Amino acid sequence: MKNLRLTVLAGGTGSAKFIRGLAKIFPQKNLSVIVNVGDNIKIYGLIICPDLDTIMYMFSNMLNKEKGWGVKEDTFNFQKMLKKYGLETWFKLGDKDLATHIYRTFLLQKGYSLTEATKILSKSLSVKAKILPATNQWIETKIVTKTGKIHFQEFWVKKQAKPKVLNVTYEGIKKAKPT
């Protein structure tokens, strides 16, 4: 098994648990993970990639395993300050996690692709596995409800998946090319 290479398609917190199990059998350097980007969202001008980050934090032993997302032992001073400014804070971004989003956004603004930015972030966190976004193009999963179309994260996190789903759309999918 030490020489066997494995590629996994991943998305969401369940994938991190599955891959954590695989990482006990296979060396990290033998694992490639192609990760969902349809849940990515822009918040406060930052590019947030929840599924990529969950996998990256899992491999770097930084993942908050209780929640299944975010960085363990993270603080939320950034969120508290935003709340004082009167901004919505339904999408929880920890202070350490925030550094990831700031750095990723900086790299993307400098012209790096999402694949390149993910490689740089992963290397900085000593991740040996190859983590690849499914595409470098921007895709958004939108949920259509009675009140209109909302981003998947707003549906899942802010509204706790309560509205009745009438349809699901994937904006940008037709222009997306595999990584």
PLM region spans:
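Short glycine-rich anion-binding loops that position phosphate/pyrophosphate groups of nucleotides
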Residues: 13-14, 34
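Short, glycine-rich nucleotide/cofactor-binding loops
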Residues: 7-13
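Extreme N-terminal starter segment of soluble prokaryotic enzymes
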Residues: 2-6
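Glycine-rich phosphate/diphosphate-binding loops that line cofactor/substrate pockets in enzymes
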Residues: 1, 179
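Electropositive, gly/pro-rich neighborhoods at or near active sites that engage anionic ligands
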Residues: 36-178
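A short, Lys/Arg-enriched amphipathic alpha-helix followed by its capping loop at the start of a domain
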Residues: 17-30
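Structural beta-sheet core signal
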Residues: 8, 33-34
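Short N-terminal binding/cap micro-motifs at the start of the first secondary-structure element
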Residues: 14-19, 41-44
